Amino acid sequence: MKPKEKLSYSILPYLQATPDIMKYQLFSKALLWLLVWVIRQISTLLILTTGRVAISSGDYDLLYKTWQGPLLIIMALGTLFLYMAFDINTQIIYASKLLEGKQIKMVEIFKESFFSIRQFFNPGGLGIVLYLTLIAPIVGFSFSLSLTSNLYIPTFISSVIYSNIYYRLFFLALTIIFLFIGLFNIFTLHGILISKMPCNKADDNSRAIIKKNWKHYLKQEFIFFRDIAIYYILFVVVVVILVIIGAVIWIDNDHMIRFVELFIALTCAVLVTVTTSLFQSYYVIMVTKLYYRYMGLLGALLPDEKRKVKWFFFRRLAMYIIPLVLLSLLLNTYFDEILVKKTNVGIIAHRAGGAEAPENTVKGVEAAISYGAYGSEIDIQRTADGYYIVNHDVNFARLCSDKRKPEEMTLDEIKELTLTDPNFPDDPEKVATLEEILDAAKDRIVLFIELKGNTADEQMVDDVVKIIKEKDMADQCVLISLKYNLIDYVESKYPKIDSAYLTFLSFGKTAQLNCDYLGLEDEATTTSMIKTIHSLDKKIMVWTPNEKKRQEYFLNTEVDYIITDNVKQATEAVEEFNNRSDIEVISDIIYSLF
């Protein structure tokens, strides 16, 4: 029999190898966690020696101004290479030994993976690492490092991209280009790790393989994903049958109906978790198998054992269902005590009134108040003659059709402009001053004043503090900024004035940054970060979740405030959250896990 006739591309043999895959993942992730933990501790100590507690998106100059900076960059690259070794290389090496029927020794695999790093110490290797770290997660390519698997384009950037058709098309074109780069280089790592090719030769080899076999490769991709879908459906069918039986038996028993709902939700959660954790390993085995075929390499290549696989499936099914039944019974018995919660998350209107009124205007503040928002966030900049006006952009081009910047104009000149929000073309306004906004907000809503633009400096802090004190509103305002040095200045000189630091990227002891509030970008707000911030008696704001699902997600966490454009939707979501049905409570909790 020819070697290629031995090859099977069904998902069944992969399921048979699942116990070994799970054991390998457990050990590889544990080893990787330990190594990275050591690097994080050393990196944190290096940051502390600079007199700071963290590096963030608004305070990263130490990377090029101190001797610790280059060391931190080297350690960051070292972390990426470690992830490359123990996150992806181990999977390919493991898959090759599994396919060849060799005895799998974890120590040998980890040793080989660690020393494989040397093959990437060149420009081509660095390019591969950076692609898998930064680009693959964003474009959705199947291979990526778990370190950055949730990497995203920050909302404040993506909103700009999607608001302009040309930006959107350019981004789409880039995504397609990078996807094709990933596709044509899908076998590059296999060439490096299995055939011991240098990076550039492995690239050429992978592209040659795809050009010759692209139809067969795409067909096998389809079969792989089809089989995954079939097992998803099979699992769901079994669960649905059990649910129908339960519903028929306990149709008039609300307590048992809730048990069934819990069981469905937990089963789906486990299915998603297990599939997600094992998917890349299965995918690597499939791709490695194809590499053996296309390169004419011999091996045992996972022969099918359908009887064993059949019993394996039902054993795994029972292994998951029994604990899920017991957990569902426990949660159902203590449902209110464990699962039901109310929220008092405060809603903050972005740019005065969010999408409910022209941005950064008095009408915006009035709209935020009318919808029951806790706060209103505004952006201030200084004029040429020293006054403070409310405007987000670097100039007035978007809203006033004037390309001049606030610092280039006097207050009188700015007051002659007509502000027309594209979302409210029939509702022209005048550019508001800080004082006008303060008067509208006093004793009605908390103002979050962002120190914005080129004029955001210590003078701005001093002037704004003076103004809000004169208005007797020091306890009704929070000064916020993306510039950490300004927030540190507020805390140092005006400790009784509340301050908030906004950041979308941070490393180190972020919670110890000198501020009263920390504002984190949507996807950067994690449960562990929330707990750490609260442990230091600080408050946390998340910006800017506009989709209802994301707002509902954060209502189910311990964040203090949500900054959003969709204020009406968010305040209604708070009310709905506090009046949820049992099934809504269950679905919200399951959603929050992911």
Which residues make up each language-model segment?
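Hydrophobic alpha-helical membrane segments
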Residues: 1-345
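Phosphate-group recognition and catalysis centered on beta-loop-alpha active-site segments
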Residues: 295-594
